Regions:
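Flexible loop linkers connecting adjacent transmembrane helices
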Residues: 15-21, 54-60, 88-106, 131-153, ...
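Membrane-water interface regions at transmembrane-helix termini and the short interhelical loops
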Residues: 18-23, 49-63, 82-103, 153-157, ...
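Helix-loop-helix module between adjacent transmembrane segments
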Residues: 22-25, 29, 33-46, 79-82, ...
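Loop-to-transmembrane helix boundary motifs in multi-pass membrane proteins
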Residues: 23-38, 196-205, 240-259, 263, ...
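Membrane-interface helix-loop-helix modules in multi-pass membrane proteins
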Residues: 78, 82-85, 95-185, 365, ...
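Extracellular/periplasmic helix-exit of transmembrane alpha-helices
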Residues: 125-137, 288-311, 319, 372-404
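Membrane-helix boundary/coupling elements in multi-pass transport proteins
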Residues: 180-185, 214-231, 345-364, 420-449
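Conserved small/polar residues in nucleotide/adenosyl-binding loops
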Residues: 499-503
Length: 503
């Protein structure tokens, strides 16, 4: 792919992070405070899983009852504000000096942008989400034509532009203050207009520590869902039993791969894995699309787009005040919004890190449209294919997916030609999704717990290895507590704390 004059790679115009990493120093107040807190939670989950599960359940119930409206309203407000910044006169402002240009080619930027914010979970929810909404919608009767139309759109909504608006707001704020105001590329810089130089002390350390807590729970949730999903693939392909031993092994393998990638920096490992991930994932989706009922899927995709656009304003502010669907809200909309918030510090900082030289308008359009275009394609293909399979009379697929959601994706792939090859490819793609999330998360958490001499600097390699390992330990702890539901509950709690503090 050729590059335009304003897309010269950073390697040609500036020192790489690897050349200046030796100047980075550990921020011990942030490092010790966040690591001790996370390790304490992980050990609590490992030592007393029953107690941890009970506390998580009670806390989530209270949050759903008293703060659900706040989640919904603030998410909508953030989205409107982001579009205003991007398409107003402020949209011409660059994330960098006025004469700066993008550091990465458009393809590299788009690949990293989408891979950092989308994880293995999209394999899980692209089938489990639509199937669940079709069989048991929040309101109305399931297994109807209306339920089929609503099912995929609900999943698109939960993975849609509302969440990316949270990422974009954080990324714009961090990028602006780092590149235009010469502040550190850390979460504390986003609060500089409010607190000023007070952020240079304990207050700033607390903000960055909270960002690390949110990041690690968000990433651990994605990784936990990922290893459960991958365990299914390994059982089908190689007969490896599902369970904690296999999942622990997958966590260790993925953390090792993520560590190797993260220690090479953005310009090498992370960029390469992101690009490879995009290509293989697109091939996988294209295979299902071409070998399946292509005519039906084309019609369904167009219909999904129309339904999504038409119903978006209603869904964005939907609290179901007149319906008793608190359990559904906790499991779906509130969980997803908390999940996006938990990831916002990490992804926003990462987006700012790779977006130097782009205008706010480019940034908003890119972050809102590029990942969602992929999500739309992926969810529409796999979600509609799954619903079509159920409506064609395959009740066993419906029952299995509802009972064991992580099975749904692979059961759908078993219907495709060359099923063994495609399931093997899907497992590898899932592993790459896992690694690109984990390596980016380890890099950002290491940077948040360091004093960096420049915005292009990265933390010492050992610190990235530490955070990759702690993320794996927390993932294992939450899986032992209760698997995916425990991870979801922990994310809702951390998301609520971050939501409230950010507001």
């Amino acid at each position: 792919m050729s590059q335009s004059a304003d897309e010269t790679p950073i390697e040609q115009v500036a020192p790489t992070p690897e050349n200046i990493r030796q100047d980075a120093k550990v921020n011990f107040p942030v490092f010790l405070g966040s690591s001790v807190g996370i390790l304490a939670i992980a050990l609590w989950a490992l030592i007393s899983p029953t107690s941890a599960a009970e506390v998580l359940g009670v806390a989530v119930g209270a949050i759903s009852k008293w703060f659900g409206w706040f989640y919904i309203a603030l998410a909508a407000i953030i989205l409107v504000f982001v579009f205003f910044l991007g398409f107003s006169r402020y949209g011409e402002t660059r994330l960098g000096p006025p004469n700066s240009r993008p550091e990465f080619s458009t393809f590299s930027w788009a690949s990293m942008l989408f891979a950092a914010g989308i994880g293995t979970d999209i394999l899980f929810f692209s089938v489990a989400g639509p199937v669940s909404q079709y069989l048991h919608p929040p309101v109305g009767k399931g297994e109807t034509v209306q339920a089929a139309r609503e099912a995929t759109v609900w999943t698109l909504f939960h993975y849609g532009i509302t969440g990316w608006g949270m990422y974009a707001l954080m990324g714009m704020a961090l990028g602006y203050f780092a590149y235009r105001r010469k502040k550190p590329l850390s979460v504390r810089s986003a609060l500089y207009p409010i607190f000023g130089d007070k952020l240079n002390g304990p207050l700033g350390h607390t903000v960055d520590g909270a960002a690390i807590l949110g990041t690690i729970f968000g990433v651990a949730t994605t990784l936990g869902i990922g290893v459960v999903q991958l365990n299914v693939g390994l059982e089908i392909l190689f007969g490896i039993d599902q369970g904690i031993p296999a999942q622990v092994g997958l966590v260790i393998l993925a953390v090792a791969m993520a560590t190797a990638s993260a220690t090479t920096g953005i310009h090498k490992g992370i960029r390469f894995l992101s690009q490879l991930n995009v290509v293989l994932a697109l091939f996988l989706a294209a295979w299902v699309f071409i070998t399946g009922r292509t005519d039906f899927l084309l019609n369904a995709i167009v219909m999904n787009i129309g339904d999504f656009v038409w119903s978006f304003p209603r869904r964005a502010l939907e609290t179901f005040a007149y319906n008793d669907v608190s359990a559904w809200m906790s499991a779906w909309t509130l969980f997803f919004w908390a999940w996006w918030v938990a990831w916002a510090s990490f992804v926003g900082m990462f987006l700012a890190r790779i977006s130097r030289g782009r205008t706010l308008r480019e940034f908003v359009v890119g972050t809102m449209l590029i990942p969602f275009s992929y999500v739309l394609m992926w969810v529409a293909i796999f979600g509609n294919a799954a619903i079509d399979l159920i409506r064609s009379g395959d009740n066993s697929f419906a029952e299995a997916t509802l009972k064991t959601p992580e099975m749904g994706f692979y059961l759908l792939l078993q219907q495709c030609p060359a099923a063994v090859f495609i399931m093997g490819l899907a497992t590898f793609v899932g592993l790459l999704f896992y690694v690109t999330s984990a390596d980016s998360g380890a890099l950002i958490m290491a940077n948040l717990s360091s004093f960096l001499p420049t915005v292009r600097s990265d933390a010492p390699g050992w610190l990235r290895i530490f955070w990759a390992g702690v993320t794996g330990l927390l993932t294992i702890g939450m899986l032992i507590v209760g698997g995916i539901p425990a991870l979801q509950n922990a994310t809702i709690i951390m998301g609520c704390l971050l939501y409230t503090s950010d507001a």
